[in-house]
Amino acid sequence: MESIVWLLLLSPALVAGSLHPRIDNGLAKTPQMGWNSYNYYSCSPNEAIVRSNAKALVDLGLADLGYRYVTTDCGWSVADRLPNGTLTWNETLFPSGFPAMGKYLHELGLLFGVYGDSGTKLCGSPPDQVGSLYHEEQDAKTFAEWGADSLKYDNCYSDAATNYPNVNYEPSTSPRPRYEIMSSALARVGRPILFQICEWGIDFPALWAPALGSSWRIGNDIIPEWRSIFRTLNQAVPNTDFAGPGQWADLDMLYVGNGVFSLPEEQTHFSLWAILKSPLTIGAALKDDDTSINQASLEVLKQKDVIGFNQDALGVSASLKRRWSDEGYEVWSGPLSGNRTVVAVINWRDESRDLTLDLPDVGLQYAQVARNIWGKTVVRDVRTSYTAGVAGHGTMLLELQGTIPSGLYPAKIFAKSTDQKTTFESIYAATTSANYELAITFSRPSTETVTITTSSGQTISISGKSGRIALTAGSNTITIQHKTPIESIQITPPTGTYYANTVFNVTGSAKHTTCGSGCSPVGSKIGDLSPNSNAYTSIPATTVGSKYLAIDYINNEVAFSSSWGWGSNSRNLTVSVNDGAPVRLEVPLSGRHSELFSPGKGWWDTATLGVLTSGWKKGENKVVFGNQGGEDGFQTYAADFVGVRILD
């Protein structure tokens, strides 16, 4: 059976194959792990700092867990090259030199990471430090001669058309050609050097970076504020299915251990970076003359299960499955090797509470084992849902084993039988509908007529093995009167009816626009939904109750320049039924093309998220999409609205 998760939560763009040609140098078969100086020491590293932190990787047992790349970020170089044109280090800060640094790291069993820039100067200038622009071939050879194992390659002072400013988030040309040049130069040095592309997500590098390097930054820098976690995850949503062996979406370095986040926040940060298959780069001061990492944060970084999710051989990123904006939580999930599944339920509220995972939201109906990683508990025989306490800003991180796909209910797990009556419990319904398809598998061939009673109050008789039944959104029971023993039942949700934006009327500033080849599946959308406007239509329903809506939206509010402050890359979108209370979604980014140079600038790329709406009546229903709450601090304009599938 096609999973309801596939039906409701994946846009056509995400279903299509998206692993682009990738560099094939044998590196980064799993996401790289290590330590970088920037998040704690900014652009002020020195030899003693790097060496002491590198030794701490070994002494604290982190190197044995895979943290091996040690990178000195900005602040290591000087303003001028040597007379022969080669790069050199700041001899005051690094008196032994970079070749000696590489030798020291290699003797510790670690890997030597260097940092460069595709512009005229390194980030962090002034004081000026020379970049690699127009010197790529020479610098690649120099890095190799020093014994470098990786290169983080930044994007400052790089836009010639605007006289090489420190930062330009809207350059006149793509950063791609500069990264192609360095990638080619590295390929010729005769030494494997892992290339980390760090151009901040400009020009949607997921489309081209995998052919050049082993990882690409998806967005602007993480900042030492909790809100940056939500912003980064929103940016990650359209990148997740590009990840794979040798090509990883980089969510930026970790702030775990820097005294910025609470312990639950650090667990959330580390969990999501891990399951999205981001490189795991420690940004904390592990050990120097003045400080050392606290034990609780160290235990987060050393959590072997979470590291195992990141380094899993299957190499598939988790993706966003559901988001409840008003309720303040969301669900991410992805497959692991060994037929396992990892699930993260994030509690965005700053209060502890119980949260429930409905397994069908991640494509499952049953788990033989549920391991709660941070809760340190193991539960067996999980049927349809799992509930646990989650700390404020914390995450319920689960490893599910021995799973059954959603919609399949084996009698030995879900049913109780007496004589010729079998009652199935924990039957999940995403929507209230009389159009669910029930298929019965008997233990032996049978053509008998059976009587079915559902908890919605329906009683029907069906001949053969299948029929249509009514279920209510939530948990249901089904009782079957029969003679032949039942092995299992399978329930398929209704496919529903799709309503394109073109059948909606608009008010205020809202307007219909066409999209060239984009805005799948209809080629148009409604944009400019401000708080004083909406899109409305009348939609028929065959039953009373709550209905699941799969909403097609577009958002490419990348918010590069505003991300340093309170800038948000989510967009508000609300839906109300029959003038009832609106259900609100803060939708993440959907753009999967360049925000600068593609025909639609990423605003033609459709994604899908689902919500459950109440207040439906039999017959015609007034359905309104808008931007309620936009006047209260959410985005001035809602996400663009493409269409909606109503499951009735």
UniProtKB/Swiss-Prot annotation:
One of its GO terms (biological process) is polysaccharide catabolic process. GO terms for cellular component: extracellular region. Disulfide bonds join C123-C156. It is found in: Secreted. Residues 1-17 form the signal peptide. This is Probable alpha-galactosidase D. It catalyses: Hydrolysis of terminal, non-reducing alpha-D-galactose residues in alpha-D-galactosides, including galactose oligosaccharides, galactomannans and galactolipids. It is an enzyme of class 3 (hydrolase). Belongs to the glycosyl hydrolase 27 family. SUPFAM superfamilies: (Trans)glycosidases, Glycosyl hydrolase domain. Glycans are attached at N84, N90, N339, N505, N572.
